[in-house]
Structure formats: structure tokens, C-alpha cells
Amino acid sequence: MNEPSPSDWHLDAYDYELPPDRIAQSAVEPRDHARLSVFPDREQLWHRHFYDLPQLLRPGDLLIVNDTRVIPARLYGQKIETGVPVEVLLVEEHGPGYWLTLVKPGKRLKPGSAIAFGPNPEDPLLVADVEASDPATGGRWLRFRGEAEAFWSQLATLGEMPLPPYIHTTASDPERYQTVYSRELGAVAAPTAGLHFTPELLTTLADMGIATAPVTLHVGIGTFRSVDVEDIRQHEMHSERMMVPAATVEKIQATKAAGGRVIAVGTTSVRAIEGAAASGELKPGSDRVNLFIYPGYRWQIIDGLITNFHLPRSSLMMLVSALIGRDRLLSAYATAIAEQYRFYSFGDAMLILPDAKLP
């Protein structure tokens, strides 16, 4: 929506200084009491709270939400052959019980070894065999023994929520790192823009004629990976599994036909919808998406965005810059820092809506 300049393609142009105390270590309670920086077109930022959202949207708008659910992906076990402690992060399932994982210590877990999980290594609750190394990630392919139902049951008992590396507290309430509308297990990180919604807020929006429609994009570990090429156009985006239901496509088409706005809740919802429309036509179905959105991108569907404040030099900052312009985004971030906003996964939010009107 904004024409790029050559400077928009330099990685250093997406850097900014964030005081460490602005990194939120826990979520605001209640969920919708997070602050909301409203970014209209060609006006100053408005400072609101997330519970003000109904006054900032209008009947006929459609919110696209990502209904992925975070799995308790971090496991601690022992190498059966030696008793060496092992930490496993489940990354993505490729068939029942067969997982790409990141492991510590990786060098000691060669194909053919096995890992026991549970308080008693002599009688483990889960056992996984190391089948192969993965050169692309440095991880390991593990096959868990037993039935899928038993695996998921034990994972719920043994697994821990994989909080982002910049959060140094533990999840006292794992549900606080899930959206209230999460349904489909498979993510290793939450679609954090959605953490601000409450059931009551969603009901209020629905009563006003502001609908929601789900997509599923299972957020992977690549979401935390920084861009490491100086010319961002050379960046290779990680891929993630996504599904866009036919009913969501129908709602989007009806919204557009009626003159409504399609507003993505989070960058993952953006990538799912824009990825499904990459051919020029929005199509339902399941696929993998590795769409990298940066200044110069030609938007297909999305009119607005609800998102948190992102890490410097991240692909997420580049996506938001494609919507409102890099200079304006950095200016908004500077204002947010000065106004003591909270940043990153448990932080505050932005509503980017070019034709927003102050109520």
C-alpha cells in the first residue's frame, strides 16, 4: 500500500533500540486491558486500550483469526543408552508420531539412539527413537513409540509450553499463551495478536455486525528467526502449514462485495490469506506457505491489521512496513517506547487501519 524506496531493502533500516524493561515478561490481565496504538492514515497515533476495539471498527468489517493451538512442545528426558539428560523441542509432525525436533545435546543423539521421557527412566511414559539427522535445521527426526492417542495424552502431562527466548519467566497458566479461539493443535508459538481477545469482546463485536473467520497457520520456530542478509529481498522465508476453509473464503468475498474491510488479526493470518491468494484468486485449501511480505508487496486481500510490536530486523517488521511504510512504522515504535508501551509476545498491540476515524 506504500511505494518502497531503495533504503527499504536494507536490513539495517529495520533496526531500533528497545530498553530491556519494555519487553513484556507476562501478559496483562484481563486480556483486553492491553494498550492499543491506533494507526490511521496521515494522522497522529491514537492511544486506546484493546477493549475499545468495538468503537474503532464498523459493522460489516471481518476479522481473520488464526485458530492454531500451541502444543506443549518442550520435553525433558534421558538418553536410554547412557542416561545423559536430553532436552527436546518438537518442531513439526510429519505423519503420526514422526517429528522434526531440535535437541540438546545434539552431538550425542545419533541415529539409532533412543530417548526416555517421564519421572522414572526405567518405566518411561514416552519413548522416542532417533531415526535421522536434519541438515537444514541441525535437528533430529524422532519417531515416538506407541499409539497417537497415548502420545498426545502423555505430551499434555510431560510437555512444557515453549515460550519465546526473550521471555525469562515460566508459564504459570499455560492457557494464557493460547488464544481463546484456539482449536487446531500444531503451533510451537502463539499467534500473539490474538491473545488480547476475550470471549466477551468477541461477543460484543459479533453483536455489532463485526464477524470473525478462521484460518489455521501452525506457527513454527522460524517466526523467531531474524533476517540475516543485508538486502532483504534475498531473504528466504521459512515455510509453515496452513489451511484456509471454504467458509472463510466465502465470508471474505461477501465482505468485499458489501464494501466491508478485511482485517487480519496477526501477521500469521496475513500470510495465510495473502498466501492463499498468491495466484491472484483467493482459494480455499491446505498448503505450505513461505510468503515473504516486504515493502513493494502488492496486497491482494487484507485492508487492515491488528499486530503486536515486533523484534528489530525481523520479517514481521518488514511485513507491517509493507502496509504503512517503514518510516511511519519506526516513528510509531519510537512513540510507543516513549509512551511506555510493552513490546513483543506478551506486549501491547497496534491497530493499523488506513481509513480509521476517531470515534
Curated annotation (Swiss-Prot):
Pathway: tRNA modification; tRNA-queuosine biosynthesis. Keywords: Cytoplasm, Queuosine biosynthesis, S-adenosyl-L-methionine, Transferase. GO terms for molecular function: S-adenosylmethionine:tRNA ribosyltransferase-isomerase activity. InterPro entries: QueA, QueA_dom1, QueA_dom2, QueA_sf. Pfam families: Queuosine_synth. The keyword NADP does not apply. It catalyses: 7-aminomethyl-7-carbaguanosine(34) in tRNA + S-adenosyl-L-methionine = epoxyqueuosine(34) in tRNA + adenine + L-methionine + 2 H(+). It is found in: Cytoplasm. Transmembrane segments: none annotated. Its main location: cytoplasm. The keyword Lipid metabolism does not apply. Belongs to the QueA family. Transfers and isomerizes the ribose moiety from AdoMet to the 7-aminomethyl group of 7-deazaguanine (preQ1-tRNA) to give epoxyqueuosine (oQ-tRNA). NCBIfam families: PRK00147.1 (NF001140), queA (TIGR00113). This is S-adenosylmethionine:tRNA ribosyltransferase-isomerase. It comes from Synechococcus sp. (strain ATCC 27144 / PCC 6301 / SAUG 1402/1). The gene is queA.
